[in-house]
Amino acid sequence: MKSRMPSWVCKKGRVLIVSFAASFLLALSLAALWLWQSSAADVYLGISRAEGQKINMATVGFSNKVAGLQGENLNGLALKTLRSDMDLSAVISMVDPNSLPFDSTLVRPGREMEFLPRLSSLSIQVMLAAELSRSENKLILDAKLFDVSARQQILHNRYMADMKGLTAAVHRLSDDIIYYLTGERGICRTKLAFVSNKSGAKEIYLMDLDGDNVMQMTRNRSLNLTPRWSPDGRFLAYVSYRDGNPDLYLLDVTCGRRTKISSLPGLNISPAWSPDGKWMALALSKSGNTNLYLMRPDGGELRQITDGKAIFVSPTWSPNGRQIAFVSDQGGTPQIYVMDAEGTNMRRLTFQGNYNTSPAWSPKGDKIAFVSQQNGSLHIFAIRPDGGGLLALTHGAGQNESPSWSPDGRYIAFSSTRQGRSGIYIMREDGSGQRRLSSDDADYYTPDWSPR
C-alpha cells in the first residue's frame, strides 16, 4: 500500500550523479549541486583497521583558484566544515597539517603521488587532496583520495555548487569519504529541525549539524511546536497555534507549502511518523480525555489505540514499526510505557523516579532515550526496551530535554539550559562527546534529526 500524502505535494528536487566524462558544458547549465565520479567501485576495502581504531587522514592542497578575500574565506570554510564532519564520523581522524613532513598547501594537482612515501611512516592511512575553483557563478570542489600504503588513487570526485553552497558540497564529500572507506552511510548531510524564538515568536527552523545554514521554515508569528521529520525527509509534521487551537500541520520542506491535517476540537499534538511513513501516531483530546490515535499523513483513517481517563502522549515508534513507546500518568505519575502498534499488550517501562517523559526509540532498536527528573533537574537517560540497562547520559546543571536520535543511532541531539538559555547539543549514544551546536543568544528547543 502506498503512503497517503496530500495531493498538493511539490515536485521534489534531484541531485544528479553523472560520469566523470560527462559534458562540462552540460554541467554548467544546471543550478543544483552536481557530482562527477571517476571511480566505479562503491566501497574501497583496502584500508584495514582494528575495531574502534580510527582511520588517520592527511588533508593536503585545498589550493584555491577563487581569487580575492572571498576565496580565502571559502578555503577556510571548506576545511572547517570537513574537520567538523570527520569529527562527527568518529571513524576518521584528520591529521594536523602542521605535523606533516612537508607544507600541505604546496601539494599541487597531478603531483599528489610524490608525497605519499613521506606519509608511510606516520601511521596515516589515506591522504585527501582538494582544490577549489570557480566557473562563472559556480564553485567546483575537486577532491582526490589516496591510499598511502598502496600508493594509489582510490577516489576522484568533483562537486559543483552555487557560491553559497560550499558547505553542502563538503558535506557530500564527507559522506562519500565515510561510505567509501567504511561501507557505512554518513550523516553529514542530515539536518536538525527545531523551534526557536530567534524572530521573537516560536517558529520552526532547520540547521546543519555544525550549527550553520540556519533556515526559518514558518513565519506565522504564533506558537509552533515539536517538528517531526517524515522517514523520507520530505515533510515536517508540527503543531501550531496560528489559528488559536493546537492543530497539526504538514510542511513540504522542498517548497515550503503547508497544509492542516488535524484540527479537531482540543489538542492535536505529539506527531510521530511510522518508520514506513504510512501512518502517524498523535495525541488528541477531542473526546475530553487525551488519548493516542493513528491516522494517515493526509489526515484520513483515524484510529484510536488507547482508551482511558489518564493522559496518553508523546508516542515514538520502534524501528520495525511493531511497537510504540509513549508517556502516560495512568499509574499516578508520568511514566514511559510500551505497547504494540495497534494498542495491545501495554506494559510499563520506567519505574525509577516520578517524572519520566519524551521517549525516543533508537533507529537500532536497542535503546529508548527519555527525560527523567532527578533532584529537581531534568536529565536524559537511556533504557533497553525490556526495561534493563538504565543509563544516565547527562549530568550536572541545567534542564536537559527532547532527545532525538541520529539516523545511524550513534548520536543524540537534545536541548539544554546548562549555559543559561536553552540551546541544542549533541552527544554520543553513551553520553560522551557533548557539544553545543547553537551559538547565538536565542532559545532553541525540541530538536528532531532528519533521516539520511
Where are these regions (language model features)?
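Hydrophobic beta-strand positions that form the internal "hydrophobic ladder"
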Residues: L192, G233-L236, G277-A281, G321-A325, ...
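A flexible loop/linker signature enriched in serine peptidases of the S9 family
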Residues: R185, S196-E203, R219-S222, V239-D247, ...
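Short beta-strand->alpha-helix linker/helix-N-cap micro-motif
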Residues: Y44-E114, L128-L132
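Bacterial N-terminal signal peptides
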Residues: F20-L33
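Residue-level detector of Asp-centered blade-edge/turn motifs that repeat once per structural unit
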Residues: G186-C188, P231-D232, P275-D276, P319-N320, ...
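Amphipathic beta-strand/beta-sheet edge segments enriched in Tyr/Trp
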Residues: D42-V43, P109-D176
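Short loop/turn segments that connect beta-strands within beta-propeller blades
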Residues: S149, D208-D212, D252-G256, R296-G300, ...
